[in-house]
């Protein structure tokens, strides 16, 4: 049964926002109680948090579908809907979050680091929140926004100070088992280790972690022998230690050729050229092993490697190797920038939601793209004429109509915003559109507000009784003569 998983694809669905409520307050002796529809609750979000007690992505391998709860709808009497519960997924230290296309969204390193990978939908406003001086009793409310929906790839890259690299059966697992408390599986056949093993080493005043990376073979950088999956775990290592088998029975192999082959794979993988290296010539307790180590040692030292002759079985030479590891780790930590103690919650990149663009589509339609217009479209109930009118007013205030006119759009053209398409008829003609202002076909003559003189004349006509003479605008009185 699989016990270690370092790559999974999660199908994430954040919660949808609850719809706003349309309600009018009803109470005895209050005929005009006003709107009291509450707002919808926000949908739950999906977040990833680093937990030091988690070491594998195994749980997500069996449960890849994740969905947060939706927000509740608003209700009358100004009752807001409850927010959906946020869903927190615990991941190992060193988890990289990517899109299916390979774009890195977050690199989670450090206990408590949190990334909001899918944000819950915003709850719709009720008619009480939409009321203003002009619109005293709205007969509509906003719909809740749908939550984010995406597929995310989680990859685990082990966080260790030192990585042990080498051919299969070079003795890497045996070495980590004697210098730390790690208990990896050890056997006398290749590829016994199929998953990275981590161990903590304490020597002198230094404490560091060591990763036993599964064996590499020529072609690993191109994926041969699961090499890409194994090489991923050495990316974060500050120091690399070549573990070389000096007692191999393969006539075509020798320690120098093994190191050259592994170095070629590390170079092909990329990004590891600046890591300091050590060489551990292992199995010198085996007959002819010590002789071969002494033969190749001068050649390796001439290449700039620090070479140690060791035996994981008898523990010979391990103390010197561990001290050298500690020195290199201390130097790497001193050169690294200081780590902030406060864990910051990483959120998706903010956008300028006030901006929008207008472009002509190949099919002749005009496409409006922008965070606000698209969000307003999602929040509008198109079965409610008043809600559609409110949307038109908001788009006009944002400048969408003006920009469409300047781009060359004509009345009746097809306009596409988000997933909605409609025929465009500007609310009012402006100076950039030829014609009389107010000549919109949707505006009837009866909707024009009468002048003050017309209103005064109409009031006098209503007050005049049949048979009475028309009222004079002049005041009657004595002339004083």
UniProtKB/Swiss-Prot annotation:
Subcellular location: Cytoplasm
Residue ranges of domain Obg in the record: 2-159
Cofactor: Mg(2+)
All copies of domain OCT, residue ranges: 348-426
Coiled coil: none
Segments forming domain OBG-type G: 160-330
Annotated Mg(2+) binding sites: 173, 193
InterPro entries: G_OBG, GTP-bd, GTP-bd_Obg/CgtA, GTP-bd_prot_GTP1/OBG_C_sf, GTP1-OBG_CS, GTP1_OBG_dom, GTP1_OBG_dom_sf, OBG_GTPase
Domain of life: Bacteria
Annotated positions binding GTP: 166-173, 191-195, 212-215, 282-285, 311-313
Subunit: Monomer.
Job of this protein: An essential GTPase which binds GTP, GDP and possibly (p)ppGpp with moderate affinity, with high nucleotide exchange rates and a fairly low GTP hydrolysis rate. Plays a role in control of the cell cycle, stress response, ribosome biogenesis and in those bacteria that undergo differentiation, in morphogenesis control.
Protein name as catalogued: GTPase Obg
Organism field: Salinispora arenicola (strain CNS-205)
Gene name of this polypeptide: obg
């Amino acid at each position: 049964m699989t016990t270690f998983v370092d790559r999974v694809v999660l199908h994430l669905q954040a919660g949808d926002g609850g719809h706003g409520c349309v309600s009018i307050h009803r109470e005895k002796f209050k005929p005009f109680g006003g709107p009291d529809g509450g707002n919808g609750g926000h949908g739950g979000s999906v977040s990833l948090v680093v937990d030091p007690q988690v070491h594998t992505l195994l749980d997500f391998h069996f449960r890849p579908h994740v969905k947060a709860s939706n927000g509740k709808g608003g209700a009358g009497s100004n009752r807001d809907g409850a927010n959906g519960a946020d869903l927190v997924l615990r991941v190992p230290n060193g988890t990289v979050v990517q899109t299916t296309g390979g774009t890195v969204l977050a690199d989670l390193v450090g206990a408590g680091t949190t990334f909001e990978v899918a944000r819950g939908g915003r709850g719709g406003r009720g008619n009480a929140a939409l009321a203003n001086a002009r619109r005293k009793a709205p007969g509509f409310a906003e719909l809740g926004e749908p939550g984010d929906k995406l597929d995310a790839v989680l990859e685990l890259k082990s966080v260790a100070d030192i990585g042990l690299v080498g051919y299969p059966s070079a003795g890497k697992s045996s070495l980590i088992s004697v210098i730390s408390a790690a208990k990896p599986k050890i056997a006398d056949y290749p590829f016994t280790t199929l998953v990275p093993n981590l161990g903590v080493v304490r020597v002198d005043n230094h404490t560091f972690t060591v990763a036993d990376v599964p064996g590499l073979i020529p072609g690993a950088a191109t994926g041969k022998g699961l090499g890409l999956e194994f090489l991923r775990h050495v990316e974060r290592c500050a120091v690399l230690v070549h573990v070389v088998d000096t007692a191999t029975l393969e006539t075509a192999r020798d320690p120098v050729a093994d190191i050259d082959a592994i170095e070629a794979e590390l170079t092909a993988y990329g990004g590891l050229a600046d890591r300091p290296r050590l060489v551990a010539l292992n199995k010198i307790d085996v007959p002819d092993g010590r002789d071969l180590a002494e033969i190749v040692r001068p050649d390796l030292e001439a290449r700039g490697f620090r070479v140690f002759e060791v035996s994981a079985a008898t523990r010979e030479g391990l103390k010197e190797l561990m001290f050298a590891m500690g020195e290199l780790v201390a130097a790497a930590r001193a050169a690294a920038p200081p780590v902030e103690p406060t864990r910051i919650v990483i959120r998706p990149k903010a956008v300028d939601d006030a901006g929008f663009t207008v472009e002509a589509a190949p099919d002749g339609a005009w496409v409006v793209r922008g965070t606000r217009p698209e969000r307003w479209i999602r929040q509008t109930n198109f079965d409610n004429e008043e809600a559609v009118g409110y949307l038109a007013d908001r788009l006009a205030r944002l400048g969408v109509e003006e920009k469409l006119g300047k781009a060359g759009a004509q009345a009746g053209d097809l306009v596409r915003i988000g997933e909605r398409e409609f025929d465009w008829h500007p609310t009012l003609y402006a100076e950039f559109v030829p014609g009389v202002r107010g000549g919109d076909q949707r505006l009837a003559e009866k909707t024009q507000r009468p002048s003050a003189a017309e209103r005064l004349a109409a009031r006098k006509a209503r007050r005049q009784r049949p048979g009475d003479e028309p009222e004079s605008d002049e005041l009657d009185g004595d002339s004083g003569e």
